[in-house]
């Protein structure tokens, strides 16, 4: 190297400058091949590929962050009245992310088209700069931290709700909202749905669609305070669906070993400013004075389900309860299609509304069951002497007028009980429901087949449901084509759950057969009469000594009453006796040791 430098010194100055210039030119052309500037402006194709790759990574990430608990449970509730004294331990097991993570699946119909676009735009922009929000799990949650992707929240504590509660008429605020991140970074945000823990005492409005930073009509957004870190879980994300699409993941009865008891179990829908009785001897007055009944009886419940009482928040709340006490496992689009066809009931207290203003008259009602105790009872004239007469299911009158009377004001039924009665008793004269311009129909909605029956009724089509395979007729035939919708009433699931929780909570609900239990149709009808009437007399219901009588008053031969597991006849017998002893109802009880013989 030194020899080369020594030789270069002997060259002329012009040659040396020429060599130096050549070396510089060489380096100028060779340098870019060694140092390449990173490409900061990718092509459209490269950008798309990068976004897809990052999206897949963000979707896979929550799975690794999910808690390792054996069972992950959540609770979601819309604003409803607060819990009362009958609330028991909470033991829900599953509320899957697919169910509550799909805001679009439960968005109002008019916003269905907007939801996928909004959500897609939020998920595809600058995923590396997303700031996600977290939701709370149960008190046994995992370590606090931030989780990416769509998350869903739960809170075992009951939230504040600004509605009327139970007997106390207290007001509280239970809130559920769908939230967005507090700041948009890179114009991106992920959405989440959360139940605010009781400790935060926030008043957030529920929304019906996916929330974004831009305020939309009818949509309220809120931010989870960043200072409070709560235990969290990151459930796997779910695709957007519309409310009319059946969801893959949802609350299922099979996931519960006994009836789930939610912290909003005792929150019901109430009628504010309803009519009040002026009868001094009314059931409602007696109930308020009874040490036993004053803790159970709620006089201002919403009794009927109609288009005014069906919305997204009600669906979300009632989906936690199995039919007939809620909407669990039902088809949203079917229920919506049916219920929204029923006009609002002007007054829940139908019978009080029929009285002149200021009237002190007491409304008397007879509720006629189908028990064999009425055979040869000669109670027909007494039954007809009441202001209103309630009947149910196979209300066979022809040939039994002396025992059961002839008048009908209310007819209660389920799709199953009505179609079975038409099938079994059709050849004995029960070819249609009781008819008359003043007859009102009370439909107790047991489950899917009842909504399928109603759909066929409203469309005037033949019932094709496999759940009613024995009835291939148009439901309107049972009403002789003279049905008026203002006289066809659907009983509200809240009202039926109130009956079950406060009067007829069977031990069956605490076991494996909880799903099939419900009070008898007669029991539901009798407790409905307690809400509508001032004075109630019950005929044909189970009493002590029921073994002496046939199953039904219209049986042509003696049949033993069978205690099926889906009903609790012993419990009902005890409740009717207690109501009778308290002077709330007058229960017809047949004296004497003899067995009543069936008519031929």
Swiss-Prot record:
Q: Where in the cell is it found?
A: Golgi apparatus membrane
Tissues expressed in: Expression is restricted to the gastrointestinal tract. Highly expressed in goblet cells. Also expressed in various tumor cells.
Report the domain of life of the source organism: Eukaryota
Q: Provide the alphabetized UniProt keywords.
A: Disease variant, Disulfide bond, Glycoprotein, Glycosyltransferase, Golgi apparatus, Membrane, Signal-anchor, Transferase, Transmembrane, Transmembrane helix
Pathway of this protein? Protein modification; protein glycosylation
Reproduce the UniProt comment on modification after translation. Glycosylated; autosialylated.
| Amino acid composition bias (Basic and acidic residues), ranges on this chain | 46-55
Task: Return any one Pfam family short name.
Answer: Glyco_transf_29
User: GO molecular-function annotation terms?
Assistant: alpha-N-acetylgalactosaminide alpha-2,6-sialyltransferase activity; sialyltransferase activity
User: Which residue pairs form cystines in this protein?
Assistant: 279-362, 365-533
- Kindly list the biological process annotations in GO that this record carries: host-mediated regulation of intestinal microbiota composition; oligosaccharide biosynthetic process; protein glycosylation
Q: What is the enzyme's main class?
A: transferase
> Any transmembrane segments, and where?
15-35
Region Disordered, as annotated, extends over: 38-191, 208-248
Reactions it catalyzes = a beta-D-galactosyl-(1->3)-N-acetyl-alpha-D-galactosaminyl derivative + CMP-N-acetyl-beta-neuraminate = a beta-D-galactosyl-(1->3)-[N-acetyl-alpha-neuraminyl-(2->6)]-N-acetyl-alpha-D-galactosaminyl derivative + CMP + H(+); a 3-O-[N-acetyl-alpha-D-galactosaminyl]-L-seryl-[protein] + CMP-N-acetyl-beta-neuraminate = a 3-O-[N-acetyl-alpha-neuraminosyl-(2->6)-N-acetyl-alpha-D-galactosaminyl]-L-seryl-[protein] + CMP + H(+); a 3-O-[N-acetyl-alpha-D-galactosaminyl]-L-threonyl-[protein] + CMP-N-acetyl-beta-neuraminate = a 3-O-[N-acetyl-alpha-neuraminosyl-(2->6)-N-acetyl-alpha-D-galactosaminyl]-L-threonyl-[protein] + CMP + H(+); a 3-O-[beta-D-galactosyl-(1->3)-N-acetyl-alpha-D-galactosaminyl]-L-seryl-[protein] + CMP-N-acetyl-beta-neuraminate = a 3-O-{beta-D-galactosyl-(1->3)-[N-acetyl-alpha-neuraminosyl-(2->6)]-N-acetyl-alpha-D-galactosaminyl}-L-seryl-[protein] + CMP + H(+)
Regions annotated as coiled coil: none
Q: Does the keyword Transmembrane helix apply?
A: yes
What's this protein's function?
Protein sialyltransferase specifically expressed in goblet cells that plays a key role in intestinal host-commensal homeostasis. Conjugates sialic acid with an alpha-2-6 linkage to N-acetylgalactosamine (GalNAc) glycan chains linked to serine or threonine in glycoproteins. Catalyzes the formation of the sialyl-Tn (S-Tn) antigen, an antigen found in intestinal goblet cells, as well as ulcerative colitis (UC) and various cancers.
What is this protein identified as?
Alpha-N-acetylgalactosaminide alpha-2,6-sialyltransferase 1
Q: What's the source species' lineage?
A: Eukaryota, Metazoa, Chordata, Craniata, Vertebrata
